[in-house]
Amino acid sequence: MRAQKIAVRSVPFSRVQSVNKATQTETKPAEFSVGQKVVYPGHGVGQVQTIETKEIAGTKISFYMIRILESDVTVMVPINKVASVGLRAVVSSKEIEDVYSMLRDKKIVVEQTTWNRRYREYMDKIKTGLIFEIGTVVRDLCVIRQDKVLSFGEKKMLELAKGLLVKELAIGEGSDEPTIEAQIEQIFTAVA
């Protein structure tokens, strides 16, 4: 049996702390009510429209019917699968401050890896639906953007991550999206 090589990279403490805080926002099943705004990983913020029970293969299953705000698509999430799909409440005001602190922490080291590998890592972070993970993608790409022109793929990735981040922060703060986007851009245009 051949030994496998494992690449190890150090992660700044602030990142570890952010990820730990992000996992605290996971919710237990059946904690959402009709009208509540929630985050569905990979799709963004949605609103619980109804809670319905459907019979599937002879078994009654309760679902959250969630309308995704950005795309106006309705998604059915089984109540007993909330944790496994990553459905969670919108970020709290305390977490919003932590997100802005993380964005301001521009002392990151971008590994010298291929764009394809970074792309996969960033997509994995976005797919978690955790605001701190999405925020790290935005921060990292904005920091890279200060040193070089982003490729087409990097620009699209930044646009996707920033859109998800801005939408959730706007709802969490009770603000509008252009204001939040301007605040984020201000963080990265300010002289370090």
Model-identified regions with their sequence ranges:
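A short macromolecule-binding patch
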Residues: 65-67, 71-80
